[in-house]
From Swiss-Prot:
Gene symbol of the encoding locus: RE2
Keywords: Aspartyl protease, DNA integration, DNA recombination, Endonuclease, Hydrolase, Magnesium, Metal-binding, Nuclease, Protease, Transferase, Zinc, Zinc-finger
Signal peptide positions (record): none
Top-level taxon of the source organism: Eukaryota
UniProt organism field: Arabidopsis thaliana
Comp. bias regions, Polar residues: 738-754, 816-827
Protein's name according to its UniProt entry: Retrovirus-related Pol polyprotein from transposon RE2
Length: 1456
């Protein structure tokens, strides 16, 4: 007879991978179309049965033998179903995928979607009914406003949908009908789930149910039966029907023992002692009817109780224990069920947990064990034992046997005891079954040892590894350190990338620390293996070290695991971009996340969060200063690699990678007190054999611990260490501020700096016997070996534990990279040339002086102590000078020396906890960039600046440049009639595009506002390139793949020679002591002078013309060099220069010539120019002002403002006198001015800026609110900009539009245009016309005239650039009348007042230099430059204009 498994045959025996790339993604509105498309596709592959269930799942096993065989049809069915499951998920949008998160098969997904979207539910009917009505009104010419549509939909909803109504009403702008429909569907699904939910409590230990109307045999033991995880016998109890059953058979006599009175011959239900429970039972059944799902168990006999005795129960569905110590992992029971015993009474369940049973070869796990205090036997559910551990149990009359289900090898054999099957436990195993024989620790101690993991992970480790726990009945107390340091946002969804072996996918990212570490580390880079989740961490001092670090990492892991790295996944940071050539040469794929989208690299981001949270918790728990974060983070990664994770089925990454469990017994609490054996380091026999140190981590190249001696800063690596995990040395030490360069303070700490971290990865273990290890531990001066084989006695420290790291766990392999040398650090000598930097007591010893016998290097930076500044500035002495020439002022030292800490320096000893004691600063707010944070830290005067050696060095560099350029001569003061211009210092911190600090800059500027025109200066001019010229040249360079170099001329204004006689006072802080009344007669221009920009331009222009450049007529700041077919473009914006060209040799020659003539700082490529971030990708160049936008938002406290979709609201319209006048318009004017500069890369802001600029003379609160809306729009789009696409066609066209009488104050029209060179937006404008016009045609006509003027100028510029257009420019206008006027020679009296515009355009059109073409209003891109638009229209036009967030990642086309 054929079995059921043989009857089910798959229709298609081939495994097919369905291509669903052409299937439209499922949304909440297109289910019917989507389902037909998907069903037809799978029907074509003959796989539709997997969707509708007609192809059922075959049985997992087949055969009638004792050991079943795997069913090949089941394996084939499961593989095909998973492929279909994945394909369907890929065809579902992200908003719909949560609805099918519980489905495990393709058929379940299909049925779930059908129930949600195919039923004629209230949400679907409501949507269709209202959308149909709205469409009918629109067809009748009476369209309903969107706000009214939303109101009509919401007012017809029942009370069950009130939460949705409240959420929509709380929004500033009403959502779309599609979004409302999605919310109604979600709410409807929740209501259906609440109405149809069935509560099914757990079942446990089904043994008996007392019922006088049944003859069921209650003895479930003693038969010779086989049980394994494949039997189909139901273990659930089925209640008997009410009433008596008719059974004519003679009942057999009962041969077992009663479970109540222990007398043989009758069962428990016929026991005489049972009658005393009858009344109680009947009363309980009448008030609380019995449910078949209630947990039940046998009533234990009154035999001697042994908590370690376990009985096998073939009818039980849950394990039960009455001894809490049997549970290694436990948690309170939250269900509402009790265990019912044979007499009908119930026993409460208080906890659930896990346990394990030992066998000859492996332990068997008992999961979901119920802790019932009042039961007297421990019961093992045979069903759960077999299914959990993949074993089978064979019962015999006097014994039983447990076998491995896969191999059939016997694991354990037991005998019956008192006619019960009792699990055999030897006396020596009775204690070790559930607890370790070593010393026990509390849950809190294990929580600290393991790096403060979550409660689930902690319990999993304790359970699976049988760790010794003291007082297991106590719950884990709340950990304040975890609450403080592990607060986080809601996680993102998991990635769909799968891997099948180690190193197939390596995820990497760089983390930046706001605090410079004690070893001068600012960053760390991680490499995470996707398959095992194993993590490697390398500390970095600069991001540029990532490439070399990856090369070392690649060699290390590929050699260790004998496999190659397949794919590196990272972000688009410059530190990873430079790896592309190396990766391609070695056959490694490089996947990158889209710019500013860290969620796509979620594995690395989550790993960062895990590492940082655990590291900060370790620091906080041990009161360790945050400057030690590399040590804490390395320990955190060390522990993370050894902690089980649900992603690996509660395996640890270490075990997944190396195939063996980690050793947890060597773990100690980070930062606790430790006492290493230091006898080999002593100079004489009377020195202490040990010192109190702080435990800082685990050695990865040796089987040893890292111990930091805080007073001396020495880091010992020792195997023989005693630990006191209750004491933390850092918590009892008073610290000053951090010794990092970024956090110096006037108060000096009383503790020295420490050793640097090794350059090896901090978390790389590997199995032993891989070759010789490099020893980096400190070694004694005379001893040949730092380790001693004699065990240290711990008798004198009863409260401490002596520990030695186990050698059973793999250690790190040797590292081929550089290792730290064991040489003492040589302290820098202080220079006494500067009076400010002199040590007040140079002969006194410094407490930071390194120990000459120290085997470890000291920190290269000692703690600075800056003396208290005086009220006057100490001036450097000037050397003697001749009468004809003034010698240069003495420069400030370029590298200020390190000042040693005075031994008697005051130390903060008060008890108040401050951030300064921990060496930290207040955390930055969201998007808080360095410029906004450092705005108040920039000195205002020279007196303030001279207190800081960094500003003092910057001032010295500026003075050196002035002296080297011979900018002035020191002369006696001129007659009183001659103006003496003052001067002052301007201090600025220069930042990179990512907000990181670049350098400190001090600029000496003249007070040019004191100059008088005609006397002190004649003409002024500043070389400023037009923004349109910049965009045109960059577009041409990108299209032709030319290199673009960025130059910065150092002290550019100092290059210009003055023709006027100008006198300036001596620089503050650098006054000649011998001639303090002298003044500086300027020879060269200096910043701040009215004529300085013009003098610099004349100097630069003269030089460029001599070397062959031609000055452009259209833009005087543009220079063109052409030699044969080679051409070079140079754009000048004051002292910033862009240069590009088609000949790299000529380009390099030009750059070298400029560097020889001027002091030029050259950048490798364009990246940050005039506050514009330029990101070049293979598809083109993206220009944005992200950092400038964020700085503006930070300055106005709008970083956390709620974003809006449009910069201006469509209603109400702004008027001149609406609202209340602002008392102080300064801030309003400043923000509008900033927005004007921001419009350089944001044409979507042009109209808003133009509109708000009209009220700068008298702004009101209405205008201020409109300005704040623009800032809110920027808060949601800080990284938007224009994209110059490669492969562009150089055709010129423009869109022109006008808003006729749009200003209700004076009824003047607003015209706007946007000009394109191919797909590149190169010029745009939004401004009011000069006067009132009488028709829309006239307004549009004047706008076309203005646009044609701009096109004519652009054509002239293109001609000078050597670019010839193949077709005349085209202007697109949406006004038919204006288009006809341009094309037809018509003129009459009504057009007299626009005759000039008419003749100008007519000549352009008739000569063929211009064409005017009509375009539909829906395609008029300039519409967004003349009036506020709705959200949908604005976003549509912004996208068409070319304002995007990031450049296309895979060659996407920018559609216009």
């Amino acid at each position: 007879m054929a079995t059921h498994a043989e009857e089910i045959v798959l229709v298609n025996t081939n495994i097919l991978n369905v291509n669903m790339s052409n299937v439209t993604k499922l949304t909440s509105t297109n289910y019917l179309m989507w389902s037909r498309q998907v069903h037809a596709l799978f029907d074509g592959y003959e796989l539709a049965g997997f969707l509708d269930g007609s192809t059922p799942m075959p049985p997992a096993t087949i055969g009638t033998d004792a050991v079943p065989r795997v069913n090949p049809d089941y394996t084939r069915w499961r593989r095909q179903d998973k492929l279909i499951y994945s394909a369907i998920l890929g065809a579902i949008s992200m908003s719909v995928q949560p609805a099918v998160s519980r489905a495990t098969t393709a058929a379940q997904i299909w049925e779930t979607l059908r129930k949600i979207y195919a039923n004629p539910s209230y949400g679907h009917v409501t949507q269709l009914r209202f959308i149909t009505r709205f469409d009918q009104l629109a067809l009748l010419g009476k369209p309903m406003d969107h706000d009214e549509q939303v109101e009509r939909v919401l007012e017809n909803l029942p009370d069950d949908y009130k939460p949705v109504i409240d959420q929509i009403a709380a929004k500033d702008t009403p959502p779309s009908l599609t979004e409302i429909h999605e919310r109604l569907i979600n709410r409807e699904s929740k209501l259906l789930a609440l109405n149809s939910a069935e509560v099914v409590p757990i079942t446990a230990n089904v043994v008996t149910h007392r019922n006088t109307n049944t003859n069921r045999n209650q003895n479930n033991r003693g038969d010779n039966r086989n049980y394994n995880n494949n039997n189909n016998r139901s273990n659930s109890w089925q209640p008997s029907s009410s009433g008596s059953r008719s059974d004519n058979r003679q009942p057999k006599p009962y041969l077992g023992r009663c479970q109540i009175c222990s007398v043989q011959g009758h069962s428990a239900k016929r026991c005489p002692q049972l009658h005393q429970f009858q009344s109680t039972t009947n009363q309980q059944q009448s008030t609380s009817p019995f449910t078949p799902w209630q947990p039940r168990a046998n009533l234990a006999v009154n035999s001697p109780y042994n908590a370690n005795n376990w009985l096998l129960d073939s009818g039980a569905t849950h394990h039960i224990t009455s001894d809490f110590n049997n549970l290694s992992f436990h948690q309170p029971y939250t269900g509402g069920d009790d265990v019912m015993i044979a007499d009908g009474s119930t026993i409460p369940i208080t906890h659930t947990g896990s346990a394990s049973l030992p066998t000859s070869s492996r332990s068997l796990d008992l999961n979901k064990v119920l802790y019932v205090p009042n039961i007297h036997k421990n019961l093992i559910s045979v069903y759960r034992l077999c299914n959990t551990n993949r074993v089978s149990v064979e019962f015999f009359p006097a014994s039983f046997q447990v076998k491995d289900l896969n191999t059939g090898v016997p694991l354990l054999q037991g005998k019956t005891k008192d006619e019960l099957y009792e699990w055999p436990i030897a006396s020596s195993q009775a204690v070790s079954m559930f607890a370790s024989p070593c010393s026990k620790a509390t849950h809190s101690s294990w929580h600290s040892r393991l790096g403060h993991p979550s409660l689930a992970i902690l319990n999993s480790v304790i359970s699976n590894h049988s760790l010794p726990v003291l007082n297991p009945s106590h719950k884990l107390l709340s950990c304040s350190d975890c609450f403080i340091n592990k607060s986080h946002k809601v996680p993102f969804s998991n990635s769909t990338i799968t891997s099948s072996k180690p190193l197939e996918y390596i995820y990497s990212d760089v983390w930046s620390s706001p605090i410079l570490s004690i070893d001068n580390y600012r960053y760390y880079v991680i490499f995470v293996d996707h398959f095992t989740r194993y993590t490697w961490l390398y500390p970095l001092k600069q991001k540029s070290q990532v490439k070399d670090t990856f090369i070392i990492f690649k060699s290390l892991v590929e050699n260790r695991f004998q496999t190659r790295i397949g794919t590196l996944y990272s972000d688009n940071g410059g530190e990873f971009v430079v790896l592309r050539d190396y990766l391609s040469q070695h056959g490694i794929s490089h996947f990158t996340s889209p710019p500013h989208t860290p969620e796509h690299n979620g594995l690395s981001e989550r790993k960062h969060r895990h590492i940082v949270e655990m590291g900060l918790t370790l620091l906080s728990h041990a009161s360790v200063p945050k400057t030690y974060w590399p040590y804490a983070f390395s320990v955190a990664v060390y522990l993370i690699n050894r902690l089980p994770t649900p992603l690996l089925q509660l395996q640890s990454p270490f075990q997944k990678l190396f195939g063996q469990p980690p050793n947890y017994e060597k773990l100690k609490v980070f930062g606790c007190a430790c006492y290493p054996w230091l006898r080999p380091y002593n100079r004489h026999k009377l020195e202490d054999k040990s010192k109190q140190c702080a435990f800082m981590g685990y050695s990865l190249t040796q089987s040893a611990y890292l111990c930091l001696h805080i007073p001396t800063g020495r880091l010992y690596t020792s195997r023989h260490v005693q630990f006191d995990e209750r004491c933390f040395p850092f918590s009892t030490t008073n610290f000053g501020v951090s010794t990092s360069q970024e956090q110096r303070s006037d108060s000096a700490p009383n503790w020295p700096s420490h050793t640097t971290l090794p350059t090896t990865p901090l978390v790389l273990p590997a199995p032993p016997c891989l070759g010789p290890h490099l020893d980096t531990s400190p070694r004694p001066p005379s001893s040949p070996s730092p380790l001693c084989t004699t065990q240290v006695s711990s008798s004198n420290l009863p409260s401490s534990s002596i520990s030695s790291p186990s050698s059973s766990e793999p250690t790190a392999p040797s590292h081929n990279g550089p290792q730290p040398t064991a040489q003492p650090h040589q302290t820098q000598n202080s220079n006494s040339n500067s009076p400010i930097l002199n040590n007040p007591n140079p002969n006194s010893p410094s407490p930071n002086s390194p120990n000459q016998n120290s085997p470890l290097p000291q920190s290269p930076i000692s703690s600075p102590h800056i003396p208290t500044p005086s009220t006057s500035i100490s001036e450097p002495n000037s050397p003697s000078s001749s009468s004809t020439s003034t010698p240069p002022l003495p420069p400030v030292l370029p590298a200020p020396p390190i000042i040693q800490v005075n031994a008697q320096a005051p130390v903060n000893t008060h008890s108040m906890a401050t951030r300064a004691k921990d060496g930290i600063r207040k955390p930055n707010q969201k998007y808080s960039y360095a410029t906004s944070l450092a705005a108040n830290s920039e000195p205002r005067t020279a007196i303030q600046a001279m207190k800081d050696d960094r500003w003092r060095q910057a001032m010295g560099s500026e003075i050196n440049a002035q002296i080297g350029n011979h900018t002035w001569d020191l002369v006696p003061p001129p007659p009183p009639s001659v103006t003496i211009v003052g001067c002052r210092w301007i201090f600025t911190k220069k930042f990179n595009s990512d907000g990181s600090l670049n350098r400190y800059k001090a600029r000496l500027v003249a007070k040019g506002y004191n100059q008088r025109p005609g006397l002190d200066y004649a003409e002024t001019f500043s070389p400023v390139i037009k923004s349109t010229s910049i965009r045109i040249v960059l577009g041409v360079a990108v299209d032709r793949s030319w290199p673009i170099r960025q130059l910065d001329v150092n002290n550019a204004f100092l290059q210009g020679t003055l023709t006027d006689e100008v006198y300036m006072s001596q620089p503050p802080g650098f006054v000649d002591k011998d001639r303090p009344d002298y003044v500086c007669r300027l020879r060269k221009a200096i910043y701040g002078l009215k004529q300085a920009p013009r003098a610099w331009y004349v100097e630069l222009r003269t030089y460029l013309l001599t070397v062959g450049f031609v000055n452009s007529i259209s833009d005087t700041s543009l220079f063109v060099l052409q030699r044969g077919r080679s051409i070079i473009y140079m754009l000048v914006y004051v002292d910033d220069i862009l240069i590009t060209g088609n000949d790299t040799v000529l380009l390099k020659h030009t750059l070298d010539a400029l560097s020889q003539r001027f002091s030029v700082k050259e950048h490798e490529d364009l990246h940050y120019f005039l506050g514009i971030e330029a990101k070049r990708v293979p598809q083109g160049l993206h220009l944005s002002q992200r950092r400038y936008t964020l700085d503006l938002l930070a300055r106005t406290n709008m970083l956390t403002a709620k974003p809006v979709a449009t910069p201006m609201a469509t209603s109400p319209k702004l008027t001149l006198h609406s609202g209340t006048k602002l008392p102080d318009p300064t801030e309003y004017r400043g923000i509008v001015g900033s927005l004007q500069y921001l419009a350089f890369t944001r044409p979507d802001l042009s109209y808003a800026v133009n509109r708000l600029s009209q009220y700068m003379h008298m702004p009101t609160d209405d205008h201020w609110n409109a300005l704040k809306r623009v800032l809110r729009y920027l808060a949601g789009t800080p990284d938007h900009g224009i994209f110059l696409k490669k492969g562009n066609t150089l055709s010129l066209h423009a869109y022109s539009d006008a808003d006729w009488a749009g200003d209700t104050d004076d009824y003047v029209s607003t015209n706007g245009y946007i000009v394109y060179l191919g797909h590149h937006p190169i010029s745009w404008s939004s401004k009011k016309q000069k006067g009132v016009v009488r028709s829309s045609t006239e307004a549009e006509y004047r706008s076309v005239a203005n646009t044609s003027s701009e096109l004519q100028w652009i054509c002239s510029l293109l001609t000078e650039l050597g670019i010839q257009l193949s077709h005349p420019p085209v202007i697109y206008c949406d006004n038919v009348g204006a288009t006809y006027l341009c094309a037809n020679p018509v003129f009459h009296s009504r057009m007299k007042h626009i005759a000039l515009d008419y003749h100008f355009i007519r000549n352009q059109v008739q000569s063929g230099a211009l064409r005017v073409v009509h375009v539909s209003t829906h395609d008029q891109l300039a519409d967004t430059l003349t009036k506020p638009l709705s959200r949908v229209a604005f976003q549509n036009f912004s996208r068409k204009i070319g304002v995007i967030k990031v450049p296309p990642s895979c060659g996407g086309v920018l559609r216009i």
